[in-house]
Amino acid sequence: MKLFGTDGVRGKAGNFLTAELALRLAMAAGVYFRKNSLTNMILVGKDTRRSGYMIETAIVAGLTSVGFNVRQIGPMPTPAVAFLTEDMRCDAGIMISASHNPYYDNGIKFFDRTGFKLDEKEEAEIEKIYFSDKIINEARKQMMEIGTAKRVDDVIGRYIVHIKNSFPRSETLHNLRVVIDTANGASYKVAPTIFKELGAETIVLANEPNGKNINENCGALFPQNLANEVRRLRADVGFAFDGDADRLVVVDENGEIIHGDILLGILASYLKESGELANDKIVATVMSNKALDDFLAKIGISVIRTNVGDKFVLEKMREIGSNFGGEQSGHVIFGSFAKTGDGIVSALQFSACMIKMHKKSSEISKMIKPYPQILRNLKIKNKKPLDKIKGLDEFEKNIQKDGIRTLFRYSGTENLIRLLLEGKNEKLLNKKMDEAEEFFSKALND
């Protein structure tokens, strides 16, 4: 059985993600982090899911049983856990969250002492320890070697100060009316506080978590309520976060959702203009629209692409010395302020952009026009490796001759292949997509 997926360990709470699994996983992680331990302390945060109590208790039991002292900070955004792990000099950080998933799912993700998510190799080490009864049994402590646990309630202030420092000191939000949707999630206290302290007239939606309403018809995946409220209240802009606040969706004053690639492009150009973009390079994923590349090329910024997943974006940023990157889905990483996607930082930077440019949010969004894209999910019987599909290379080259960008990839969880075509001629795109569906239906349903 494989534990780790693309973003830590995730599954249905009480089914796959049981208290027993969480306890043993915490023990395995404790054994792994023991090798380079400096403070014998691990930070644990969570979002607002009901199952968080069960999983947190199990993790605390697992960590203390192998001798670690634990600091529990309660509901806080994922980027807050990353920041506080380093700021409080902990050996590691653990976030209990399933991000944008429904309340009945939950997850566990790990951060090293510097606040970076573990890479695949490090996760594989923890998984190896998890499945070794010998290592787990030998790691158990007794008597005074057993660790302690302490709930820490005053860390929210540290994170708020840190986030406010990402906003230009010469500016204020006094002239902005902002609507915020916290998805009944981890940012329900932090986000409104930050915007109010910076002077914005702040209206807050979905900030009454009850354990099961996280992401429920609200937040980054359901921004329509936010859009309606922005229009009704004649606000300047709306910001929607997901359950753990590492993702952002922006709504303009007309209630229109701003495309994720437009957000990346505008923020990158703002950093460049401010003299804060490192190496004139940003990182995006293979899903990002080519219009992003073309817009940024005009102002001397290169776009380097990587696989889907904010973890891969950050790895590539570190590799090429960039301090900015993100995904079309709303994960935006400001490397100078955060070690992971941070929706609140991104919202503040967009607000600063509006103020500095003296433009409405809708005017900013019109600076980039994404090329038409068609995405279809095709049900298939088998997932033959793409490089083994006869005739695929030739088929792709024929499509690309017409100026169309192609991306074909399998779903990680279902028997689906995702077909993405992008180009300037929508009629031609539809024709080529029909051809692509026919090609893959024959190739993968034999």
From Swiss-Prot:
Q: Which CDD domains match?
A: GlmM
Any single biological process term in GO: carbohydrate metabolic process
Q: Which residues carry this modification: Phosphoserine?
A: 99
Give EC number(s), comma-separated: 5.4.2.10
- One GO molecular-function entry: magnesium ion binding
Where in the sequence is the active site?
99 (phosphoserine intermediate)
Cofactor: how and how many bound = Binds 1 Mg(2+) ion per subunit.
Known catalysed reaction(s)?
Answer: alpha-D-glucosamine 1-phosphate = D-glucosamine 6-phosphate
Top-rank taxon, per record: Bacteria
Q: Which UniProt keywords apply?
A: Isomerase, Magnesium, Metal-binding, Phosphoprotein
Identify the Pfam families for this entry: PGM_PMM_I, PGM_PMM_II, PGM_PMM_III, PGM_PMM_IV
Instruction: Tell me which cofactor or cofactors this protein depends on.
Output: Mg(2+)
Q: What are the annotated GO cellular component locations?
A: cytosol
Q: Which residues bind Mg(2+)?
A: 99, 242, 244, 246
According to the UniProt record, what class of enzyme is this?
isomerase
Query: How is the polypeptide modified once translated?
Result: Activated by phosphorylation.
Q: Name the family the entry cites.
A: Belongs to the phosphohexose mutase family.
Kindly give the HAMAP family that the UniProt entry links to this protein. GlmM_B (MF_01554_B)
Q: Function, please?
A: Catalyzes the conversion of glucosamine-6-phosphate to glucosamine-1-phosphate.
> Which PANTHER family does this entry report, sorted A to Z?
PHOSPHOGLUCOMUTASE (ALPHA-D-GLUCOSE-1,6-BISPHOSPHATE-DEPENDENT), PHOSPHOHEXOSE MUTASE
Tell me the protein's name.
Phosphoglucosamine mutase
Q: Which organism is it from?
A: Campylobacter hominis (strain ATCC BAA-381 / DSM 21671 / CCUG 45161 / LMG 19568 / NCTC 13146 / CH001A)
